[in-house]
């Protein structure tokens, strides 16, 4: 296990990017489903097994391919079930810190949009 000091600018930058990427992915899928009137805001986050698995996959995705799209970060807590959203964010950060050496070697296998597409397909509330 490698240790990364908090004042390491590269580690700090990637940690922030992980938060932003994870946030944008969820917000994008949420806004699309709301725009199509397929889901109601009250039932979008359901704490069942597939949803928790999706959050873990999103954490892996956000941890492996950080991005700089932070413009919607302030909207993160607008979800109806903010506790689940916040917990999923901490899960993604934990994965990022714990598995940093693995992701550094295996980024090529974790494509940028794959996990976001998985999340959208599982949470589209299609009839």
UniProtKB/Swiss-Prot annotation:
Membrane topology type: Single-pass membrane protein
Any single Gene Ontology cellular-component annotation: membrane
Subcellular location: Membrane
Main location: membrane
Tree of life domain: Eukaryota
Keywords tagged on the record: Membrane, Transmembrane, Transmembrane helix
Membrane spanning residue stretches: 84-103
Additional free-text comment from the UniProt record: Completely overlaps MMS4.
UniProt protein name: Putative uncharacterized protein YBR099C
């Amino acid at each position: 296990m490698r240790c990364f000091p908090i004042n390491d600018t590269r580690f700090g930058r990637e940690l922030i990017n992980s938060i932003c990427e994870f946030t944008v992915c969820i917000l994008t899928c949420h806004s699309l489903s709301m725009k199509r009137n397929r889901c109601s805001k009250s039932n979008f986050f359901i704490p069942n097994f597939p949803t928790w698995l999706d959050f873990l996959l999103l954490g892996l995705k956000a941890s492996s391919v950080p991005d700089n799209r932070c413009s919607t970060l302030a909207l993160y807590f607008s979800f109806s079930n903010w506790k689940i959203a916040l917990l999923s964010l901490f899960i993604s950060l934990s994965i990022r810190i714990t598995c940093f050496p693995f992701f550094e070697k295996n980024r090529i296998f974790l494509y940028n949009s794959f996990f976001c597409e998985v999340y959208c397909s599982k949470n589209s509330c299609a009839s």
